[in-house]
Amino acid sequence: MSSSDNDEPKVVEISDDEMECEGVVEVNNEQSDEAKMREFAEITATDEIMAQSILQDVGWDLKRALDVFFGSDAFKETRNEAVMGPSSSAVGNQPVMTAEDLKGFELSLMSWNIDGLDGRSLATRMKAVATIVKKVNPDILFLQEVVDRDLEPIDKLQSLYKIYYSNKGCQYYTAILVSKMFEVEKHDVVHFQNSGMYRTLQIVEGSIGGMKVFLVNTHLESMRDHRAQRMAQFSFCMDRCAEIIANNPGCFLFFGGDLNLRDEEISSIPDGVLDAWVSAGCDTKTKWTWDTYKNDNKQGFNGAKMRFDRIYWHGPFNQVHFSLEGRQRIRSCLCFPSDHWAINATFSAV
């Protein structure tokens, strides 16, 4: 893995007591909190994973948690809209692995909003995207803002990958590309009911080396004015990740894409789900994935920079390397392949 500048992103080993930089809620009365979780799950006809995520956010106040659940469109949609059935995998079929079991194993994932909606130099930019993907050679690739026009360079990656599109033929869509050694069992697409921007949640279920893997790619609602829709979508995604993990003990899960999130919009994260950039050490050199100070493909944003693109993961890896790709300007058109940098994370067990 190589960085695009002279500063090599840090590689940080994750100790057992190291959690996300956002912090961990400590529970003083475990029995009392467990009782609240059971009561919440019984009243709402949900589960204790959902109960824990809401109760943690409101300081374990059961009444406030119930008010949040029944008063929020996000949770009503999660409860009422049967957007997806449960996983076909039986609970307990997958043995729970440790870092010691995986010693020497490495898996890489790249996520990139390739800005297909911008028609300027699109054919050239898509060729550059394909060239960079081949150079970095990730095992898994999440793409957002894919369009039918000038798609040929992406389609040609099928010589290296199995390609799954969310809703090809739509104005724009997402794609998941997996290496040929990845055995795909199922591909699902969930259309967000509250989206006015054709946004979806794309899920590929399969295995690699006998290990159960779930790949979850999304492009959440854009722009500050659509904060409520975006937060509801993110909450749904995290609930779905928690459900997958609960139904498939010992699985590997990777969730990411262009989340368009501001830090203050992040709701609770399920236990055991980590942010790859945080796991790699929170290096400020790799923080900003949409950086209009360094990337001038988009004008008029006065140097705004955001960490819109993120990867979350679940599994027994104990080392994460995180880098940004696509930061070289294309000589022929003097622009970058996209207004977003690609994020690339390599997970390993040492």
From Swiss-Prot:
UniProt GO cellular component terms: cytoplasm; PML body
GO BP term, example: double-strand break repair
Cell compartment(s), UniProt: Nucleus; Nucleus, PML body
Cofactor comment text: Binds 1 magnesium or manganese ion per subunit.
Residue segments, region Interaction with 5' end of substrate DNA: 113-117, 219-224, 260-262
Cofactor annotation: Mg(2+); Mn(2+)
SUPFAM superfamilies attached to this UniProt entry: DNase I-like, UBA-like
Any matching Pfam family: UBA_8
Enzyme Commission number, as recorded: 3.1.4.-
Entry's family note: Belongs to the CCR4/nocturin family. TTRAP/TDP2 subfamily.
PANTHER family hit by this protein: TRAF AND TNF RECEPTOR-ASSOCIATED PROTEIN (PTHR15822), TYROSYL-DNA PHOSPHODIESTERASE 2 (PTHR15822:SF4)
Role: DNA repair enzyme that can remove a variety of covalent adducts from DNA through hydrolysis of a 5'-phosphodiester bond, giving rise to DNA with a free 5' phosphate. Catalyzes the hydrolysis of dead-end complexes between DNA and the topoisomerase 2 (top2) active site tyrosine residue. Hydrolyzes 5'-phosphoglycolates on protruding 5' ends on DNA double-strand breaks (DSBs) due to DNA damage by radiation and free radicals.
Protein's UniProt name: 5'-tyrosyl-DNA phosphodiesterase
Organism: Caenorhabditis briggsae
